Amino acid sequence: MSSKPRRLPWLALIAAATALGAALARASGTPAVAQWDLFELTLPGPAAGNPFVDVQLSATFTHGARTVAVNGFYDGDGTYRIRFMPDETGAWRYATASNAPALAGRTGTVDVTPPGPGDHGPVRVHDTYHFAYADGTPYHELGTTCYSWIHRPEALQEETLRTLAASPFNKLRMCVFPQGHNVRLMPPPLFPFAGTPPQDWDFTRFNPAFFRHLEQRVGQLRDLGIECDLILFHPYDDGLWGFDRMPAAADDRYLRYIVARLAAYRNIWWSLANEFDFMRAKTDADWDRFFQIVQHDDPYGHLRSIHNGARLYNNSLPWVTHASIQNGAAVEDPGRAELYRDVWHKPVVYDEVKYEGSPDAPRWGDLTAPELVHRFWCGTVAGTYVGHSEFFTDQAGAVWLGEGGTLRGESPPRLAFLRRILEAGPPELDPIDQWQDTDMGGVSGEYYLLYFGREAPASWTFRLPVGRQPWWPRTLPYGRLVDGMEFQVDVIDTWAMTITPVPGVFITKQKGRYAFADRDGRAVALPARPWLALRIRRVGGAEPAPGAGGN
């Protein structure tokens, strides 16, 4: 399910180097932290008045010619913290600044050792449409959504973590603020602000216990290798607490506080909102401002997106790193899924394509498992990414989408199967020819995934599209196929989770202007049922055409 086994010898060396570096740092009395881990500086300071608004605290961390500025925060009881995620090994010097004399002018050094096993750093945008960890390791996004799991009873939260640990998912979408859904059965134990529920809040004073609990869960996801796509606002308050309609100053203060607390966690992604357009008290100018606050205050440049309801945000804006889309129809076939890539030239993540659930569930939660898996495959061969959740109500009234707990659907094992296929393939898949052969993605001349979807073919005549053509008046990217290349074909049953190699190899011969066939005209026999795919990999013969650009 992961590519880790291919790197085990290196992991052992990294672990040894990390342990040695930490030991040397301890011997010198200098604090040590691994690259991309979290260094925390704790300082005592003033507790009188309202430190959340009265005290400003920051620090600069310097490594050679580089300087990184980070904001600190008040954690209650006269305690202040500054958190830092170093992205380079070596000695980093720091110096604090504050309007409180007790916090200003603190200096020191932290030794940054090589990253620990499995730590590849934060996820970044890579090659325009895709993602990779900071060290270059490919990241094949496979996410699920569980909005309010951190606001449910402790036992249910622990069950959710166990479920995630055994799941194929490497990203979790979750909310900061509680939802109104199911609140009578499972009332939130903590709230983000000082005050008394339901609506007697002091928006100038945060509740540190709430945020410590949030951080604990974010850290546990990190330790499981799961990215946390943190939803900062949502419209599901249902008029209970008013967190969806705070005044502008409270919104801005909240964003700066949560970024100061959480930006040093390498697995954080910022989702500005879920169904942003359903929050009637906010304008597009508000969302633009929120993005800019997060972008400015996060020194590490974590991924930033915003999820839509009925209306799309302008994802072309520079502070949006990738598109987070709700659109189930877009992934009913690969040709539709690809279109958003051409609009924004950014990664496209269909975080909500409807959910697997019971037939009597609301229309957004009534997909069958085969249909949800089908949408994942359509999005995959289109060079995009797709998200999961489920809406089965159990006897206690808990659903994975809202509360977490256990997964009951049939899609997760099939998504684990898809993840294994992706991680055994090239780092990224792109459409081969999105104008004509929309059901095929891959790397031209090397690797292809052909997905038949609902069709039930009895055979497939070997045929690979040339790809996009050089053409007057401008040269477009074109494919890398030539005569004499040798390919192996595997038949994939995406539902039965089987891979069946086809005997022999297929040798390419150009057939017309736009495609290559097998030189002997061979075809692949298929079992005439839906949900089939083909994996086509180059195994020898002629080399791909040199100098060809893209797919």
Task: Locate the predicted segments by residue.
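Non-catalytic, glycine-rich low-complexity segments
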Residues: 28-65, 70-73, 109-115, 436-441
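Exposed aromatic-hydrophobic patches
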Residues: 81-85, 476-478, 511-525
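Active-site mouth of glycoside hydrolases
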Residues: 120-333
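Aromatic- and carboxylate-lined catalytic core of secreted/periplasmic carbohydrate-active enzymes
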Residues: 29-32, 50-51, 137, 356-359, ...
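Bacterial N-terminal signal peptides
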Residues: 11-22
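Bacterial N-terminal signal peptides that target proteins for export
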Residues: 2-12
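Extracellular glycoside hydrolase catalytic/binding regions
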Residues: 253, 274-413
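Extended acidic/polar, glycine-enriched regions
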Residues: 68-128
